[in-house]
């Protein structure tokens, strides 16, 4: 019951780090694709 939200909690920091990395990296498309695939709920706008 509490393990479900736990998954999102440990995934949240990972997504933030990935997004920041993609923004600074030239191959952001690769990281962005992987990042989006990992989290279908969070979708950054254009």
Swiss-Prot record:
- Output one GO BP term: killing of cells of another organism
Which residues are propeptide? 1-26
Could you give the domain comment from the record?
Is composed of a ring composed by 8 residues, and a tail of 10 or 12 residues. The peptide is threaded when the C-terminal tail is inserted throught the isopeptide-bonded ring.
PTM comment text: The linear precursor LarA is probably cleaved by the putative peptidase LarD, generating linear 18-residue Lariatin-A or 20-residue Lariatin-B. These linear peptides are probably cross-linked by LarB. Finally, lariatins A and B may be exported by ABC transporter LarE.
Disulfide bond positions? none
Gene (UniProt): larA
Q: Where is this cross-link: Isoglutamyl glycine isopeptide (Gly-Glu)?
A: 27-34
Q: Which domain of life is it from?
A: Bacteria
Q: Which UniProt keywords apply?
A: Antibiotic, Antimicrobial, Bacteriocin, Isopeptide bond
Q: Positions of the site: Important in resistance to hydrolysis?
A: 43-44
Q: What is the lineage of its organism?
A: Bacteria, Bacillati, Actinomycetota, Actinomycetes, Mycobacteriales
- Spell out the protein name for this chain: Lariatin
Q: Does the keyword Hydrolase apply?
A: no
